[in-house]
Amino acid sequence: MKVYSFRKEQLLFALYALIIAGALFAGLRAEYVETFAMPVSRKVVVLDPGHGGWDPGMVGKGDILEKNINLEIALKLQSLLEQGGATVLMTRIEDEALGTGKRSDMRARSTLAGASHADVIISIHQNSYPSEKVMGTQVFFYEGSERSRRLAELIQTEVKHFLGQMTNREAKSDSSYYILKQTSIPAVIVECGFLSSSTEARLLVDGEYQERMAWAIYKGIIEYFNTSGN
């Protein structure tokens, strides 16, 4: 009888130990999943789809409007970021401007972004040039911000890698963009492509290409957070 009682106690102890170990493993596993499946967890990102409403931005071949492409790419990027655990603040989620004129619109975007205390600001735009042969994505940053430079370079690298763009474009400093110089938060403008190129314009209105562009930008943001120590 004593032998049976001793074995029963051993079994109960072993079962208890397994339960504790399982709970600890579950906690570690949850932390592991959050770390790797949610790479931008607890980060705050401002997405600024350029133009909107009365301001169409660039008008490309076939009357393609920049404002619509900007919003489509930004919404796709928003989805990726939120799935990755980030809090995303959009300057607009529909076809609207933030002011009655260009200056008031830009001021409103900068004020919103600055008040957000975000980790990064990503402004989405499209480019244009007199020659139809000019193509490719280019990421701009404010020349006085080292963190913005790093963010821009990482996004530029991911765009080249993921979209296979055969250009020699590199991230470039620029002091003329209003939203870049009005904030201390790391900020970049992604000029996704040239609407003046009929070839690139066709790509930029394609939903699948927009998804790939959003993914490349997302990957660049992840790389920035992974290497910034934030």
Predicted regions and their residues:
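Catalytic-site microenvironment of enzymes
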Residues: 1-230
